[in-house]
Amino acid sequence: MGKIQLGYWILVLFIVTWSDLGLCKKPKPRPGGGWNSGGSNRYPGQPGSPGGNRYPGWGHPQGGGTNWGQPHPGGSNWGQPHPGGSSWGQPHGGSNWGQGGYNKWKPDKPKTNLKHVAGAAAAGAVVGGLGGYMLGSAMSRPVIHFGNEYEDRYYRENQYRYPNQVMYRPIDQYSSQNNFVHDCVNITVKQHTTTTTTKGENFTETDIKIMERVVEQMCITQYQAEYEAAAQRAYNMAFFSAPPVTLLFLSFLIFLIVS
């Protein structure tokens, strides 16, 4: 008799527990398709495709210039002052919070430690002021062959100048892996070149070309890691959000075993 009562209590507890877990909403990550699927090259600067930079929308010298960050006719420059506009890393016009005759108290500016930022990267630390981008974990720079001896040697000798972390948004905000990688490369290279240029170091066209290839491989690695993590979370949620009929069947089996 005592064993039957124990079985009933276990059955009730099991049903209540699984009912609560069944209310959880299953996430629906939207990972994209395979890399370079569809048979076409999405980035026209790769070997075997027409020459040129694969991410031409920013930072590349126009009119035959060689150094990144120099003024371009008719365009804007990262890290350079723009008439009537604002620049990365440059003072912006307008009013500042905490100044003027209304607020006497001014909070201290927080100190940012880059080591702390890198340490939080594994948890997907959100980078402030960059529209919700996260900083990925530090990676070893990939081994890449560029198809000619000069660029291979240049990369080996200068790879320390290139980033070892990427910036990205969650993969469920992109329709495909290609879109994720393209955005990841753009924001990572922009941020790195802007930060480095403000320290007085410029980048040549060769630097930009090599950096894009390196960061692209790192962004692919980051996407794969995010995709696997999202798939694991979806699997766990699917298990705990099983249909009520399945839960009742499992509860009945446990009741029979206990009884």
Curated annotation (Swiss-Prot):
<dbReference type="InterPro" id="IPR000817">
    <property type="entry name" value="Prion"/>
</dbReference>
<keyword id="KW-0034">Amyloid</keyword>
<keyword id="KW-0333">Golgi apparatus</keyword>
<feature type="binding site">
    <location>
        <position position="74"/>
    </location>
    <ligand>
        <name>Cu(2+) 2</name>
    </ligand>
</feature>
<dbReference type="InterPro" id="IPR022416">
    <property type="entry name" value="Prion/Doppel_prot_b-ribbon_dom"/>
</dbReference>
<dbReference type="GO" id="GO:0005886">
    <property type="term" value="C:plasma membrane"/>
</dbReference>
<keyword id="KW-0186">Copper</keyword>
<feature type="binding site">
    <location>
        <position position="84"/>
    </location>
    <ligand>
        <name>Cu(2+) 3</name>
    </ligand>
</feature>
<keyword id="KW-1015">Disulfide bond</keyword>
<dbReference type="InterPro" id="IPR036924">
    <property type="entry name" value="Prion/Doppel_b-ribbon_dom_sf"/>
</dbReference>
<feature type="region of interest" description="Disordered">
    <location>
        <begin position="29"/>
        <end position="110"/>
    </location>
</feature>
<feature type="region of interest" description="Interaction with GRB2, ERI3 and SYN1">
    <location>
        <begin position="25"/>
        <end position="235"/>
    </location>
</feature>
<protein>
    <recommendedName>
        <fullName>Major prion protein</fullName>
    </recommendedName>
</protein>
<keyword id="KW-1003">Cell membrane</keyword>
<feature type="disulfide bond">
    <location>
        <begin position="184"/>
        <end position="219"/>
    </location>
</feature>
<feature type="binding site">
    <location>
        <position position="72"/>
    </location>
    <ligand>
        <name>Cu(2+) 2</name>
    </ligand>
</feature>
<dbReference type="GO" id="GO:0005794">
    <property type="term" value="C:Golgi apparatus"/>
</dbReference>
<feature type="propeptide" description="Removed in mature form">
    <location>
        <begin position="237"/>
        <end position="259"/>
    </location>
</feature>
<feature type="compositionally biased region" description="Gly residues">
    <location>
        <begin position="91"/>
        <end position="101"/>
    </location>
</feature>
<comment type="similarity">
    <text>Belongs to the prion family.</text>
</comment>
<keyword id="KW-0677">Repeat</keyword>
<keyword id="KW-0472">Membrane</keyword>
<keyword id="KW-0449">Lipoprotein</keyword>
<dbReference type="Pfam" id="PF11587">
    <property type="entry name" value="Prion_bPrPp"/>
</dbReference>
<dbReference type="InterPro" id="IPR025860">
    <property type="entry name" value="Prion_N"/>
</dbReference>
<keyword id="KW-0640">Prion</keyword>
<feature type="glycosylation site" description="N-linked (GlcNAc...) asparagine">
    <location>
        <position position="202"/>
    </location>
</feature>
<keyword id="KW-0325">Glycoprotein</keyword>
<comment type="subunit">
    <text>Monomer and homodimer. Has a tendency to aggregate into amyloid fibrils containing a cross-beta spine, formed by a steric zipper of superposed beta-strands. Soluble oligomers may represent an intermediate stage on the path to fibril formation. Copper binding may promote oligomerization. Interacts with GRB2, APP, ERI3/PRNPIP and SYN1. Mislocalized cytosolically exposed PrP interacts with MGRN1; this interaction alters MGRN1 subcellular location and causes lysosomal enlargement. Interacts with KIAA1191.</text>
</comment>
<feature type="binding site">
    <location>
        <position position="64"/>
    </location>
    <ligand>
        <name>Cu(2+) 1</name>
    </ligand>
</feature>
<keyword id="KW-0479">Metal-binding</keyword>
<dbReference type="GO" id="GO:0098552">
    <property type="term" value="C:side of membrane"/>
</dbReference>
<dbReference type="GO" id="GO:0051260">
    <property type="term" value="P:protein homooligomerization"/>
</dbReference>
<feature type="binding site">
    <location>
        <position position="94"/>
    </location>
    <ligand>
        <name>Cu(2+) 4</name>
    </ligand>
</feature>
<comment type="function">
    <text>Its primary physiological function is unclear. Has cytoprotective activity against internal or environmental stresses. May play a role in neuronal development and synaptic plasticity. May be required for neuronal myelin sheath maintenance. May play a role in iron uptake and iron homeostasis. Soluble oligomers are toxic to cultured neuroblastoma cells and induce apoptosis (in vitro). Association with GPC1 (via its heparan sulfate chains) targets PRNP to lipid rafts. Also provides Cu(2+) or Zn(2+) for the ascorbate-mediated GPC1 deaminase degradation of its heparan sulfate side chains.</text>
</comment>
<feature type="lipid moiety-binding region" description="GPI-anchor amidated asparagine">
    <location>
        <position position="236"/>
    </location>
</feature>
<feature type="binding site">
    <location>
        <position position="82"/>
    </location>
    <ligand>
        <name>Cu(2+) 3</name>
    </ligand>
</feature>
<dbReference type="GO" id="GO:0005507">
    <property type="term" value="F:copper ion binding"/>
</dbReference>
<feature type="signal peptide">
    <location>
        <begin position="1"/>
        <end position="24"/>
    </location>
</feature>
<dbReference type="Pfam" id="PF00377">
    <property type="entry name" value="Prion"/>
</dbReference>
<keyword id="KW-0732">Signal</keyword>
<keyword id="KW-0336">GPI-anchor</keyword>
